[in-house]
Amino acid sequence: MVPTQMFLTRGVGVHKEKLASFEQALRSAGVAYCNLVTVSSIYPPNCKIVPRARGEKLLNPGEITFCVMARSETNERNRLTSASIGLAVPTDRRTYGYLSEHHAHGETDEETGEYTEDLAAQMLATTLGVEFDPNIAWKEREQVFKMAGKIVRTLNITQSAIGKPNRWTTVIALAVFIPEENIPKRRR
């Protein structure tokens, strides 16, 4: 089973109970009705990213649904928490790319998002033989990767929130793989 479609989503939940906060985040992300199974970080060859709204319509309640998930939570007042998924897509769509996940405290959306995007690009670059200096800033490395002609696109989806008093705050970011049997034949 190699997925051919996936979507990116994110959510935030706040509740006095930790588990209920996670459930609220899943609802916010639009995937609470699925049985999520987390997998490692490979973006499948020939996989297409579809809009969240389309992807949600292709999932069924109770279905086993594979995803890459980043999750962070806090019950500390005013603590910034964030979760992000980064993606690096190779120029040759017949080969695989990378998804990375990161969760943090005290990092902004931009910091967390850039970190995951950079991490996914680094993982892909090393498998493609692209040489780079890991000590230079992400924006410079991004240009090196793209100029090498082997990485066509990088992106991230990130969610952050600030902890509320006497409440759990959970943030999640996900890459959700759509089961092949759910994709109408004409859309494959």
Per-region residue spans from a language model:
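Helix-coil modules at protein/domain termini and other flexible surface or pore-lining loops
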Residues: 1-188
